[in-house]
């Protein structure tokens, strides 16, 4: 591992990386930039926070991801739908949304009611699993979880996840109707995102305290739906011999248990290049291409 060379690459190329951390065998061994002082947009890495909250909530409410998502969504909104829409969404389990395997959903909800927008999308073949990455799926899971809990999901996350992890610098977004927006909009420090990664690396424990069930972590980090990138779990991505938390513009937390590594960085690089990833793999993972 040559972390200094990775940092030199970042600086020399002018990559807008806010900060980076590397953990080996649960210990912070390298850091660069702003890792603890300021929060930064993590975009779709927000979905990973929602994913772990799904399991945490099982301590307080029976939340069965194999039930139709309509079982948990507001009944008045479901009853107001045309019969065909009710039948269609009634065939879609929470698990299908967790694994991004519902076709036809556009990328993001729009309008004054994200919920009505989402529930009125025409799903042509609800029984066919197809990878369709979008924000609506995560939004609906968040609404379903909030309704099942009967409480504000953002506040619940603060109490049940962030407090045990020692996360106290954060921001998150809401939809126009006030529901926690589980798809994007969260801000964390680099170190705070690493803590979420460490929770998953430890198969659900943090500093000796069990927060998630080991079974859920195994399911969430395993391939549940195949895609071009190698597979998708419960709002988590397969990455080499491990998995990753991803957000646009290169927000990353790579969790590699077999290598005993966690690599986290937050940045703002608005392009589709793999230069930063290639540099990380070369100097941190020792992968030559």
Tell where the protein language model's regions lie, with residue ranges.
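Short, gly/Ser/Thr-rich active-site loops of penicillin-recognizing serine hydrolases
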Residues: 275-289
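Catalytic-site signature segments of enzymes, centered on catalytic residues
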Residues: 29-36, 104-186
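Active-site-proximal alpha-helical segments within enzyme catalytic domains
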Residues: 140-144, 184-205, 251-267
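Non-transmembrane alpha-helical segments in soluble domains
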Residues: 55, 70, 95-99, 142-146, ...
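Active-site SXXK
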Residues: 26, 41-66, 141-145, 196
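A short, well-structured edge-of-sheet supersecondary motif
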Residues: 3-36, 65, 253-256, 260-264
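Active-site Gly/Thr loop motif
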Residues: 215-266, 270
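Active-site helix/loop module of the DD-peptidase/beta-lactamase fold
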Residues: 60-100, 148-188
């Amino acid at each position: 591992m040559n972390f200094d060379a990775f940092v030199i690459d970042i600086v020399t190329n002018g990559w807008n990386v806010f900060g980076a951390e590397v953990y080996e065998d649960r210990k912070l061994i390298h850091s660069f930039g702003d890792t603890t002082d300021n929060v930064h947009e993590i975009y779709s890495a927000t979905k990973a926070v929602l994913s772990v909250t799904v399991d945490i909530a099982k301590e307080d409410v029976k939340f069965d991801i194999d039930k139709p998502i309509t079982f948990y969504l507001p009944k008045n909104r479901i009853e107001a739908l045309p019969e065909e829409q009710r039948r269609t969404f009634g065939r879609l389990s929470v698990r299908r949304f967790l694994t991004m395997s519902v076709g036809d959903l556009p990328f993001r909800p729009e309008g004054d009611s994200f919920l009505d927008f989402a529930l009125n999308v025409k799903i042509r073949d609800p029984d066919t699993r197809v990878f369709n990455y979008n924000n609506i799926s995560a939004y609906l899971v968040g609404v379903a979880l909030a309704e099942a809990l009967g409480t504000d999901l953002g506040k619940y996350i603060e109490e049940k996840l962030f407090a045990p992890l020692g996360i106290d610098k954060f921001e998150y977004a809401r939809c126009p109707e006030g529901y926690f927006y589980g798809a994007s909009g969260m801000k964390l420090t680099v170190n705070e995102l690493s803590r979420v990664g460490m929770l998953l690396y430890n198969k659900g424990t943090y500093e000796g305290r069990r927060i998630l069930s080991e079974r859920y972590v195994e399911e969430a980090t395993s391939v549940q739906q195949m895609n071009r990138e190698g597979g998708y779990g419960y709002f988590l991505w397969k990455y080499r011999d491990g998995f990753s938390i991803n957000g646009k513009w290169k927000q990353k937390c790579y969790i590699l248990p077999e290598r005993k590594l966690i690599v986290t960085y937050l940045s703002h690089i608005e392009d589709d290049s793999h230069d930063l990833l290639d540099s990380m793999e070369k100097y941190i993972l020792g992968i030559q291409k």
